[in-house]
Amino acid sequence: MRRIDKIYHQLKHNFHDSTLDHLLKIQGNSAKEIAEQLKMERSNVSFELNNLVRSKKVIKIKTFPVRYIPVEIAEKLFNKKWDTEMMEVKDLQAFSGNSKQNHQHISTNPLELMIGAKGSLKKAISQAKAAVFYPPNGLHMLLLGPTGSGKSLFANRIYQFAIYSDILKAGAPFITFNCADYYNNPQLLLSQLFGHKKGSFTGAAEDKAGLVEQANGGILFMDEIHRLPPEGQEMLFYFIDSGSYNRLGESEHKRTSNVLFICATTENPSSALLKTFLRRIPMTIHIPSLEERSLNERVDLTTFLLGKEAERIKKNLSVHIDVYNALIHSAKFGNVGQLKSNVQLVCAHGFLHNLDRNEVIELTVRDLPDEIKQEWMSSSKNMQRSKAISEYVNITTIISPIVEDETTKIDEDLSFNLYHLIEEKVKTLMKEGLSKKDINQYILTDVHLHVRSFFHHQAFQKDNLLTFVEDDVIQMTKQLKEIAEHELDCTFDRKFIYFLSMHIDAFLKRGKQIDVLNTQETDEIRDTHVKEYRVAMIFKDKIQEYFKVAIPEIEVIYLTMLIHSIKSLKENKRVGIIVAAHGNSTASSMVEVATELLGSTPIAAVDMPLTVSPSDILECVAEKMKQVDEGEGVLMLVDMGSLAMLESRLEEKTGISIKTISNVTTSMVLDAVRKVNYLNLNLHAIYQSVTKDFIELWERQPAASGKKKALVSICTTGSGTAKKLEDILTTIVNKASDTPIHILTVSSIKLANSIKEIEKEYEILATVGTKDPKINAPHVSLEVLIEGEGEKLIQQAITKGSISLSNGLNEANIIVRELCEDSLKKYLVFLNPHHVIDMLLEWLQTVQDELGVIFNNAVLIKVIMHTAFAFERVIKQNPIAFSEEEEINDQLKEMVYVTERTLAPYEEKLGLRISDDEKLFIAAIFAEEVHGQLF
């Protein structure tokens, strides 16, 4: 039986007759307990238990020490299906629904306890309080700040403050969702957010509640919100607007949920998020970086983090002021997150150096990691900095363990107790007869590996890695990565370079064989992981040859285990790009420019000399597509329309999804590569985005015959009105014709001369604006355009009369949409202008059908604007009163009846009811239009 199977069976056996109370009390088995039962090394048992967690067979409970329980046992005792998204939990009590932690009473204001509450966080805390208290259900919030600045912690403090203030009930849910996990799978994203119905897609074996449902009555924290694709943002703001949703595959009834959203991003929200989504998140809160915090706050943060480490060690720390100085000025690219990592490294060094001391762990300059120590020693500002820090700490400061209550508790990031790990390894290595010096060197290099690997797990950067791994190790690791990919026929992501380079670096610095596996276990590893072992042997030869060191067999076994453990890691999949153009080097030149400027991308060039046959081109493009496809499809940028005709044949031949854009230019290639590398969009979204961005370039191309076509917009000043008119005309043109038509704006001053110059180059289809130039083309005045008839005239001028628009609203009314949306975007906070306009246009069509009238655009705009703001006032709870003192006549009563009856379905759709007085105002507009009077 394999080692992993022995461990799994032992774990199951330990709980086969256990009760739920017993399980909740002991929370599973630790790796040490299983190791003692099976007489194996604890590190090997821990390794296999984590493999079982990854394979969804065992649950990890992140207590101290970490404990494990088989999924099968948990499902049996809890009498419910275990959610496979929850393979690592903090406490089994939470799953039982009886968590004391979730229902505790919070007696102290959690926000005021934060370091910087009266300093750098004062404004952020004030904003958070205002957002929580805002009636009726609080304002959604967006937290802005660099990586590691504490956005997640701040979101959790807001949640605790809401409970403390009795805005949320004790035990209200606080759900965290990282948008980066599902950015490239809209269907799975929809399922995660809103749940799904059994059978709604492949793999949906049962009904599942989404996060919106789980967060009902509480807070949903959405981290890395900039990674949420546009489709996901639209799903979300529809829910924010209406409060209702359907599970995926469900249509029979609407579900409702009351959720306060807290979003977080490191990016500029105006460029990373849809404007329509941003309007739904009215409260933006900036979380300061470490650099933006005062020295006093940075000292307090360092003291707090040292106190947390003292709690984990269960001893007092004696910290020299130079250690404070070095730590406070060591965190550059990681903010508070890196400061925490550095504090852990210093404490680990100090712990190892003071293993034989019972009371106090001394932290001095000797305990600083080399990179921090070198930076500290090379600084010319040390005396000045130490003097400033001495105002807050003594030359030597005694720090006692900090025992937090739930209102101040920071989640532990590491799934193991670092100091327990050090003690375990020291004991093991002492049994092997190693000297204290060798043990220290071995332990410290491995501690760096553990702490640094956690800190950098989200974003690999070579420059960061170079601070603690030699460049020649990184270069060798890159070669080994290529070998592993070829031998194992799989693709590793960049983290492979990180983990393997750290391991090799640790081995080279240890310089001695550390053998803690017995013969039986090494034989099992060889037999179980044959392919990985073969690759590890190749690695051995390469490393020996390059670094001129001997690699013992036990190190090959460790390499085998490492390769196996990271084999499943994958790089984020991206859309591939093919640039195909006629000529000997046209496509290659464009691709070369793009890769040089924007870095590595799944892109390939296909140069097509004019002598190459179509069948050869097809084969060549198909082969290149297979090379660049990462499973997300391929965008094909071509120079001629004839190549675009190959799309369906290529899809059939390769099985790869393809989108094609013609008239490729270097600028277009750069735009596509930028979007693939940095925006995390799917194939369809990138295709649409590139097409949209370059349509203006195509429109500037001259017509195939005769002059270019144009509409001329005439305004008095050529400023704001001209821009709005240009936007409206652009929309009309896009709806009416695929032919490039230019929109030219001129001032009514010197109009005659301007028109003469335009006529030399353009065929003027129509003029629109404040003054008629009296030329041989139809003119549409602003009044006619706004009233509604002008839109029809312009479309007829464009199409030479071939389009006949209906008078109803089933056809999109461009003028009404443009003018209303422009205003509503500025002033609506809670409602989605686009959806509101669609809904109200549909409603007004019903009203017109019922009354047998056709309202002009001025009336439509007036009613839409008033009704949209009336719905907004319902949310804000400040409706306006109808103050007319005269008696309401029969005509107005009739309009009130029509208004109430026709508007009712839309009120139900939004879950909002407009007041009777607001409806009187709307009815009065109808009465004036139909009967010519109000009373």
From Swiss-Prot:
<keyword id="KW-0677">Repeat</keyword>
<dbReference type="GO" id="GO:0005524">
    <property type="term" value="F:ATP binding"/>
</dbReference>
<protein>
    <recommendedName>
        <fullName>Transcriptional regulatory protein LevR</fullName>
        <ecNumber>2.7.1.-</ecNumber>
    </recommendedName>
</protein>
<keyword id="KW-0547">Nucleotide-binding</keyword>
<comment type="similarity">
    <text>Belongs to the transcriptional antiterminator BglG family.</text>
</comment>
<keyword id="KW-0597">Phosphoprotein</keyword>
<feature type="domain" description="Sigma-54 factor interaction">
    <location>
        <begin position="117"/>
        <end position="348"/>
    </location>
</feature>
<keyword id="KW-0804">Transcription</keyword>
<feature type="modified residue" description="Phosphohistidine">
    <location>
        <position position="866"/>
    </location>
</feature>
<dbReference type="GO" id="GO:0003723">
    <property type="term" value="F:RNA binding"/>
</dbReference>
<dbReference type="GO" id="GO:0000987">
    <property type="term" value="F:cis-regulatory region sequence-specific DNA binding"/>
</dbReference>
<dbReference type="InterPro" id="IPR004701">
    <property type="entry name" value="PTS_EIIA_man-typ"/>
</dbReference>
<dbReference type="InterPro" id="IPR036390">
    <property type="entry name" value="WH_DNA-bd_sf"/>
</dbReference>
<dbReference type="GO" id="GO:0001216">
    <property type="term" value="F:DNA-binding transcription activator activity"/>
</dbReference>
<keyword id="KW-0010">Activator</keyword>
<keyword id="KW-0067">ATP-binding</keyword>
<dbReference type="Pfam" id="PF00874">
    <property type="entry name" value="PRD"/>
</dbReference>
<dbReference type="InterPro" id="IPR025943">
    <property type="entry name" value="Sigma_54_int_dom_ATP-bd_2"/>
</dbReference>
<dbReference type="InterPro" id="IPR003593">
    <property type="entry name" value="AAA+_ATPase"/>
</dbReference>
<dbReference type="Pfam" id="PF00158">
    <property type="entry name" value="Sigma54_activat"/>
</dbReference>
<keyword id="KW-0238">DNA-binding</keyword>
<dbReference type="GO" id="GO:0016020">
    <property type="term" value="C:membrane"/>
</dbReference>
<dbReference type="InterPro" id="IPR011608">
    <property type="entry name" value="PRD"/>
</dbReference>
<dbReference type="GO" id="GO:0009401">
    <property type="term" value="P:phosphoenolpyruvate-dependent sugar phosphotransferase system"/>
</dbReference>
<dbReference type="GO" id="GO:0045893">
    <property type="term" value="P:positive regulation of DNA-templated transcription"/>
</dbReference>
<comment type="function">
    <text>Involved in positive regulation of the levanase operon which comprises the levDEFG genes for a fructose PTS system, and sacA for levanase.</text>
</comment>
<dbReference type="InterPro" id="IPR036634">
    <property type="entry name" value="PRD_sf"/>
</dbReference>
<keyword id="KW-0418">Kinase</keyword>
<keyword id="KW-0805">Transcription regulation</keyword>
<feature type="modified residue" description="Phosphohistidine; by HPr">
    <location>
        <position position="582"/>
    </location>
</feature>
<dbReference type="GO" id="GO:0032993">
    <property type="term" value="C:protein-DNA complex"/>
</dbReference>
<dbReference type="InterPro" id="IPR001550">
    <property type="entry name" value="Transcrpt_antitermin_CS"/>
</dbReference>
<dbReference type="GO" id="GO:0016887">
    <property type="term" value="F:ATP hydrolysis activity"/>
</dbReference>
<dbReference type="InterPro" id="IPR002078">
    <property type="entry name" value="Sigma_54_int"/>
</dbReference>
<dbReference type="InterPro" id="IPR036662">
    <property type="entry name" value="PTS_EIIA_man-typ_sf"/>
</dbReference>
<keyword id="KW-0808">Transferase</keyword>
<feature type="binding site">
    <location>
        <begin position="145"/>
        <end position="152"/>
    </location>
    <ligand>
        <name>ATP</name>
    </ligand>
</feature>
<feature type="modified residue" description="Phosphohistidine">
    <location>
        <position position="503"/>
    </location>
</feature>
<dbReference type="GO" id="GO:0016301">
    <property type="term" value="F:kinase activity"/>
</dbReference>
<feature type="domain" description="PTS EIIA type-4">
    <location>
        <begin position="574"/>
        <end position="711"/>
    </location>
</feature>
<dbReference type="InterPro" id="IPR027417">
    <property type="entry name" value="P-loop_NTPase"/>
</dbReference>
<feature type="binding site">
    <location>
        <begin position="215"/>
        <end position="224"/>
    </location>
    <ligand>
        <name>ATP</name>
    </ligand>
</feature>
